[in-house]
A protein has these predicted regions:
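N-terminal signal peptide c-region/cleavage motif recognized by signal peptidases
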Residues: 52-54
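A contiguous, surface-exposed recognition patch within enzymatic or periplasmic domains that forms
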Residues: 96, 189, 283, 287-419, ...
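Extended, loop-rich substrate-binding clefts of extracytoplasmic carbohydrate-active enzymes
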Residues: 209-264, 385-397, 401-402
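Terminal accessory/anchoring regions of large secretory-pathway or extracellular enzymes
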Residues: 60-95, 99-104, 122, 362-568
Length: 568
């Protein structure tokens, strides 16, 4: 794997990345603001609505292959934006007015049948001005689900006489018995452009996925946001544990067809098959893209004036190379700086955007529950032989902006007019599968006392618990045989000292036990690797790595990969 990182040291206020960040935040407001906090039950209030009587929808043959053919045909023609009209009244709704429109959960698709899944619909308005077409698929036949105002409680809204009904829904979410047998919890949301989010059991929503990204994080290049414009919801069987959905992707530069096979549970798995055709060249095509938030963590300098020690949806990128080696890159944001790291990889086994710190004490936020935010693992299946994994970190003013982008750019680039097929799996989970290695748990930086020209880095490695070890894995009871190995890519940097200490021993400050869901009464043994280096005064950044090795030189930990900059 090769790595290239670049930074823009100019203030963000004058940089193109501001537009990118605001665009992402605007799209994600659709999910944060409209879809995630509906009440479980609401009284039905009477209101007078004026809408055209929906006509009967005729069933049509449907298959994913036919949808792929439709997408290819669309890609061969000039882009035509969907012509779904939304009246000004709905467009001009305020946040509170739009939030007051509630979907009646007992009227959801399949809800009255008491089956394994039901579907809620989102009402367009406020920032959710784009609409999508929904179809139900039964027995290979699809039927359009026309907009129905009777499915919503409009609260105190006074809808002007003659206001046309919307011609589509803003999005949808799926429910199942995820946490308890007596309530249908939401576990999946599609809303806004090609954004979607999922959660495993006992977790709140966190980072967002997308179907596709175009030109994300490229300075001076406008980002394009293709839309899932049509969805085909396949009716599940009575005892089904899987929900299957197909979607049509449309955009100025691309058309495509997606099939999602979703299995909710302690680990919610979203299997994705996509056929994509470019209608014109793009600078960067992003597969399996994610948007997340990292405001500040234990290594952030200076920290915002906030009562919480850390605020983030994700705190690290874990990359499993084709060789099986694991590299861990902590997330970080620096005031006024834009960071873009590119990892060139061949046949990667997986990569994950993790929320690894599970201690409530690290966040102190009983409402946002950052210690319980889900992690996501991407497992390539087809079409990921060679490419670049892009990690883009942008400054943010607060926790409402998603400022972290992760995407896979396939190599070679897709050719215009040629259809490419990709298959990958997303695992939305609480904790990653144990590797049997020491794992990076925390990164901190500073300067030694009275030595401001030097840099002190500490990396905490957690020993795998015995229950996590496979047959034949070493238990590492004697840590004296381990040593940290540090590399610095700049030859001008002087490495002064390297050390390793056990900070879980009684005679040193132990890490506190976590207070989050699922935390045990004990912590794994934690070793703290540390090193001091002296960069030249004019050096603005350093690429650093650290890993633990045994006496034979065998690597026994993840490799910590870090980009240090002078403002830290």
């Amino acid at each position: 794997m090769t790595t290239v990182c670049r930074e823009n040291l100019a203030p963000v206020s004058g940089h193109e990345s501001v537009d990118i960040r605001q665009a992402i935040a605007k799209r994600l407001q659709l999910c944060h603001g409209s879809g995630m906090h509906f009440h479980r039950s609401l009284p039905l209030l009477g209101c007078v609505l004026f809408a055209a009587t929906p006509g009967l929808s005729l069933a049509e043959d449907f298959s994913f292959d036919a949808l792929c053919a439709k997408a290819r045909k669309m890609a061969a023609a000039p882009y035509a934006a969907p012509k779904l009209e939304l009246a000004d009244f709905w467009k001009n709704l305020t946040y509170d007015q739009h939030r007051d429109i509630r979907f009646q959960m007992d009227s959801g698709l399949w809800a009255k049948e008491k089956g394994p899944f039901s579907i809620d619909f989102f009402h367009p308005g406020w920032t959710a001005k784009k609409m999508v077409l929904l179809h139900e698929v039964k027995g290979g036949k699809s039927t359009a689900l026309k907009f129905d105002q009777g499915l919503f409680n409009y609260g105190k809204q006074k809808i002007p006489a003659g206001t046309p009904s919307p011609q589509g829904y803003a999005g949808w979410r799926a429910r199942t018995h995820l946490n308890t047998a007596d309530y249908m919890d939401e576990f999946l949301v599609f809303m806004g452009a090609s954004y979607f989010r999922a959660i495993p059991k006992d977790a709140p929503y966190g980072l967002s996925a997308r179907g596709l990204s175009i030109n994300s994080g490229l300075p001076g290049v406008g980002e394009e946001f293709p839309d899932f414009s049509e969805f085909y919801l396949e009716k599940p069987g009575k005892d089904a544990d899987v929900l299957r959905v197909s979607a049509l992707l449309t955009g100025e530069s691309v058309a495509g067809a997606y099939q999602f096979t979703i299995t909710p549970g302690p680990e919610t798995v979203v299997d994705v098959v996509a056929e994509i055709t470019l209608r014109r060249p793009v600078r960067q095509l992003g597969l399996a893209p994610f948007s997340s938030m990292f405001w500040f963590g234990e290594s952030t300098h200076p920290k915002p004036y906030d009562f919480r020690p850390e605020v983030h949806d994700s705190d690290g990128l874990l990359m499993e190379l084709g060789s099986g080696n694991l590299h861990y890159r902590p997330l970080e944001t620096t005031k006024g700086q834009f960071r873009h790291c590119v990892f060139t990889m061949e046949k990667p086994r997986s990569w994950s955007l993790l929320q690894r710190d599970r201690s409530f004490l690290s966040y102190q936020d009983p409402e946002a529950l950052y210690h319980n935010r889900p992690s996501v693992r991407v497992e390539p299946v087809e079409g990921f032989d060679l490419g670049k994994l892009h990690l883009i970190e942008m400054p943010t003013r607060d926790e409402t902006d998603d400022n972290v982008i992760l995407l896979w750019e396939p190599q070679p680039a897709l050719e215009v007019g040629k259809t490419a097929r990709f298959h990958y799996r997303l695992r939305w989970m609480r904790d990653p599968v144990p590797s049997g290695l020491f794992t990076v748990r925390a990164t901190r930086s500073g300067t030694p006392v009275q030595l401001p020209d030097q840099v002190l880095m500490t990396i905490d490695f957690a020993k795998p618990l015995e229950a996590e070890l496979k047959v034949g894995d070493p238990k590492w009871d004697d840590i004296s045989k381990l040593k940290p190995v540090v590399t610095i890519n700049q030859q001008s940097v002087e490495l002064i000292h390297v050390g390793l200490t056990d900070i879980s021993m009684p005679n040193v400050d132990a890490l506190p036990a976590g207070l989050g869901r699922g935390d045990k009464l004990h912590m794994p043994q934690v070793l703290r690797a540390f090193f001091v280096c002296k960069p030249p005064a004019d050096l603005t950044n350093m690429d650093l790595t650290c890993e633990l090795q045994d006496e034979t030189g065998k690597v026994v930990s993840e490799r910590w990969v870090y980009l240090w900059n002078k403002t830290q």
